[in-house]
Design a protein with these regions (language model features):
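Positively charged n-region of N-terminal signal peptides that target proteins for export
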Residues: 1-4
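Surface-exposed, charged secondary-structure patches
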Residues: 101-143, 191-201
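Short beta-strand edge/turn micro-motifs at domain boundaries
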Residues: 142-172
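Bacterial N-terminal signal peptides
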Residues: 7-18
């Protein structure tokens, strides 16, 4: 059974960040391809089943292509990022990547007829774009998910995920990460992310 999607974002109590109104872009926007690739990868991961380690091998390359994990780490760490040494910054990015892959592999654990429906309308938010999708779950309520994307290296990559179009993954993590950094610095935050990645449930 597909585990709750909110577990991916909820490292601390939820922090809501509503998406503001934005202009609609044309349907053929290249940002759609990124989200469609992610959705296809998530379905492959669920269909693969097996162990979390096996599913990680399926979803890892998809997340590396569709997410800007370096920028997501910087945004999640917030203002404290510039205070970290280059070595600590790299350690944080590596730990964030491991955590993200492990959480997706854990939560998308088996296939039960789920499907994704991507809205063809792409919204612009300054230099970023927002693509909305719906996860349809048999015998359960659909889950609205919005992705914020930014152009990087000639392609559009995801930099934030909004569950139910309101709960920002980055905002939620920034709240948690800030507390850990203040108490124990980069090493403590790396240890926390590694512990989350290693959890069996």
């Amino acid at each position: 059974m597909l585990r709750t999607l909110l577990a991916i974002a909820c490292l601390t109590p939820l922090a809501a960040a509503a998406l503001p109104a934005a202009a609609l872009a044309q349907a053929a926007d290249p940002a759609l391809s990124t989200v469609e690739e992610l959705d296809a990868g998530l379905l492959r991961t669920m269909r693969a089943g097996g162990t979390a380690q096996a599913r990680s091998k399926v979803i890892a390359p998809v997340l590396e292509r569709t997410f800007d994990l370096g920028l997501m780490t910087r945004l999640a760490v917030g203002p404290e990022w510039v205070k970290q040494s280059p070595a600590d910054q790299q350690a944080l990015v590596d730990a964030f990547k491991r955590m993200t892959i492990a959480q997706y592999a854990r939560n998308f654990d088996s296939f039960g007829g789920e499907s994704f429906e991507v809205s063809p309308r792409v919204e612009t938010r300054g230099g970023d774009k927002v693509v909305r999708t719906t996860l349809k779950i048999p015998k359960d309520a659909p889950v609205a998910i919005a992705y914020r994307l930014r152009q990087s290296g000639g392609s559009w990559k995801i930099i934030d995920v909004f569950y139910k179009n309101a709960i920002s993954q980055i905002a939620t993590r920034r709240s948690d990460f800030g507390t850990v950094l203040q108490k124990g610095g980069a090493k403590a935050l790396v240890a926390r992310m590694n512990a989350i990645a290693a959890k069996g449930d």
